[in-house]
């Protein structure tokens, strides 16, 4: 998915003025994605409500595509995750998909900076029947992550990062600190319409994405790969990593 996510650390001056970055989906990509969604993914009323309420609230349509949401759910289930950390809530679309993959005693903590986004997200999460499994932590994500490190909590089994790109590397560092060995880390928006090859296409967001990719390759406690994607959200991708 392309476009700016909620700025989760307002202390970063770049976050204050980040423009939306236009994604450029081709008609055949959109048609194929719709076919996959109808044939395999089968998004239900709860996730569709999250998209609808986000639009009604004037929020940007930058949630992951349905097939990516289903992938997150499957990754949660395949990894046997019981505790999920999400950085970037928006309207709760990804939150619902991942929450659906948790066992009944599972927990998901999601970080959101904007109160109005958190309000919409909570209504969607509760309507999906996940209110008892999900906790929204309001405020700058870096502050929330530092607070989580001070709390007496079990480490996380699954971390999904989909927030402001300038802080990607810092979010990855926190993922390693807060995740257990063997935990899965997913970082969204890793191709950014090719801006990783030409940072001039988006000089605000591209450097943070590139730095995060380099960190994924160099970090001694991360084993990672990157998958390119095309669809309604344009040409993009995600990184999939394991904490060693």
Q: Which residues does each PLM region occupy?
A:
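S-adenosylmethionine/decaboxylated-SAM
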Residues: 62, 66-244
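Intrinsic disorder
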Residues: 7-8
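N-terminal beta-alpha supersecondary unit
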Residues: 54-55
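Short acidic-aromatic active-site loops that bind/stabilize oxyanions
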Residues: 40, 58-65
């Amino acid at each position: 998915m392309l476009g700016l996510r909620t700025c989760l650390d307002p202390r970063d001056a770049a976050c204050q003025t980040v423009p939306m970055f236009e994604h450029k989906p081709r008609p055949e990509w959109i048609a194929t994605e719709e076919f996959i969604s109808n044939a395999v993914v089968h998004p239900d009323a709860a996730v569709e409500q999250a998209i609808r309420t986000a639009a009604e609230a004037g929020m940007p349509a930058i949630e992951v595509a349905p097939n990516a949401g289903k992938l997150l759910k499957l990754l949660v289930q395949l990894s046997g995750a019981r505790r999920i950390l999400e950085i970037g809530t928006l309207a709760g679309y990804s939150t619902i998909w991942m929450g659906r993959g948790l066992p009944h005693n599972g927990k998901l903590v999601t970080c959101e900076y904007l109160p109005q986004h958190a309000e919409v997200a909570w209504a969607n999460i509760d309507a999906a029947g996940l209110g008892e499994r999900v906790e929204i932590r309001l405020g700058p994500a870096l502050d929330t992550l530092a607070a989580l490190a001070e709390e007496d909590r079990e480490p996380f089994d699954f971390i999904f990062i989909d927030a402001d790109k300038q802080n990607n590397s810092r979010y990855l560092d926190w993922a390693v600190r807060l995740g257990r060995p063997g935990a899965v880390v997913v970082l969204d928006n890793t191709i950014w319409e090719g801006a990783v090859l030409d940072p001039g296409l988006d000089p605000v967001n591209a450097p943070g994405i590139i730095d995060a990719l380099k960190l994924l390759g160099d970090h001694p406690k991360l084993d990672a790969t990157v998958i390119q994607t095309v669809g309604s959200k344009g040409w993009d991708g995600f990184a999939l990593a394991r904490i060693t």
